[in-house]
């Protein structure tokens, strides 16, 4: 029923990665499951990370938090991004923590009935995204929110170069430490270390680490983590081409001799971008070049040895790492997996076997039909 293209998410490996990272940082773990757990499926990944010992889950927006609440998750949830002050009643009702990031937001928040709202103060130490830039602004926000009977649950910042620039990371940390130590109040949650910083940056100001991409075994520094996600497709047709035959839109590939070309059901509508032309995939012991332009729904590969229809093709995984694919595309692993669309089925391995196989588009179609 599904197109034969799927992302495989190994929840066992995600659990083991989190346990290992918790041992490294020796602090509370905030599992960052933004953007549907980076496209891997927040509902299932949440279950795995909580069983492995995560004490809090962080998401990007209110709708992401409500998805987890509506699925029955009662654990601590933190929204890292901006929220509307008008949504405060929803945040309080569902016990969802939010980020206070500007004086303007605080003024709007205290005009609401924000008693009992769980708040984390965001300190902008150099990312220049959201957050308070001065200690005076930070204290003013704290005083106003505390006076409004908000629960001042946490304070945090975000490193912009933890994977590449230790000097800038040290500078950001110094600013954050100064901000934290300027309070006589003890925040229950103090966090600054992201995935890469957790693996190498030792500090004693924070009491929690935010783990995101490293859950999936992707880390600049910690090479012992297990890659937990892979992408596969299947051969749907094999063609024997002759010299001079062309392949794909624009006829950008011409066969030089008799060649074997196979078609896979994956294209740029699945998030497999056109820049993949010329890269290689792995099929039945051979690396096969992607030839011709990547189409919306399909792509063609050149085979040295013929394979049967339904042969599984690895886009990234054991033989082609996600990091290698990202390097070849001049991007980052985050972007590749977040771009994988809802057309791509998610297959979940847990307790060493396939536990779930989901395609949200088909499930929505079935639900709509049932409602009629």
Question: Language-model segments: which ranges?
Answer:
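Active-site anion/phosphate-binding pocket segments in diverse small-molecule metabolic enzymes
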Residues: 2-11, 15, 64, 83-85, ...
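Conserved PLP-enzyme active-site core in the AAT-like
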Residues: 24
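Active-site-proximal beta-alpha core segment in soluble small-molecule metabolic enzymes
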Residues: 5-9, 13-16, 27-182, 186-191, ...
């Amino acid at each position: 029923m599904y197109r034969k293209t799927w992302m495989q998410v190994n929840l066992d490996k995600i659990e083991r990665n989190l346990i290992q990272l918790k041992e490294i940082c020796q602090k509370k773990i905030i599992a960052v499951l933004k953007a549907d757990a980076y496209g891997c499926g927040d509902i299932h990944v949440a279950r795995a990370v909580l069983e492995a010992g995560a004490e809090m889950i962080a998401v990007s927006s209110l709708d992401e938090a409500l998805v987890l609440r509506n699925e029955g998750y009662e654990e601590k949830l933190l929204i890292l991004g901006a929220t509307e002050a008008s949504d405060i009643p929803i945040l309080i009702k569902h016990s969802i923590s939010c980020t206070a990031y500007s004086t303007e937001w605080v003024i709007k928040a205290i005009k609401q009935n924000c008693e009992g709202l769980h708040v984390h103060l965001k300190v902008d130490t150099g990312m220049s995204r959201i957050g308070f830039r001065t200690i005076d602004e930070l204290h003013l926000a704290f005083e106003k929110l505390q006076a409004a009977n908000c629960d001042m649950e946490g304070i945090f910042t975000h490193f912009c170069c933890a994977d590449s620039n230790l000097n800038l990371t040290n500078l950001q940390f110094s600013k954050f430490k100064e901000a934290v130590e300027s309070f006589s109040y003890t925040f229950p949650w103090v966090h600054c270390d992201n995935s890469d910083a957790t693996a190498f940056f030792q500090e004693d100001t924070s009491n929690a680490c935010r783990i995101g991409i490293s859950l999936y075994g992707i880390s600049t520094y910690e090479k012992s983590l297990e890659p937990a996600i892979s992408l596969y497709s299947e051969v749907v047709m094999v063609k024997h081409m002759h010299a001079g035959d062309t392949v794909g839109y624009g006829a950008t590939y011409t066969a030089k001799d008799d060649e074997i070309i196979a078609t896979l059901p994956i294209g740029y509508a699945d998030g497999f971008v056109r820049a993949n032309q010329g890269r290689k995939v792995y099929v039945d012991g051979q690396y096969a070049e992607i030839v011709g332009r990547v189409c919306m729904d399909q792509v063609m590969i050149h085979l040295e040895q013929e394979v049967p229809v339904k042969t599984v093709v690895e886009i990234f995984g054991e033989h082609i790492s996600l990091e290698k694919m990202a390097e070849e595309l001049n991007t980052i692993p985050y972007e590749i997996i977040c771009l994988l669309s809802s057309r791509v089925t998610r297959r979940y391995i847990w307790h060493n076997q396939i536990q779930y196989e989901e395609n949200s588009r088909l499930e929505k179609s079935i639900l709509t039909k049932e409602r009629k």
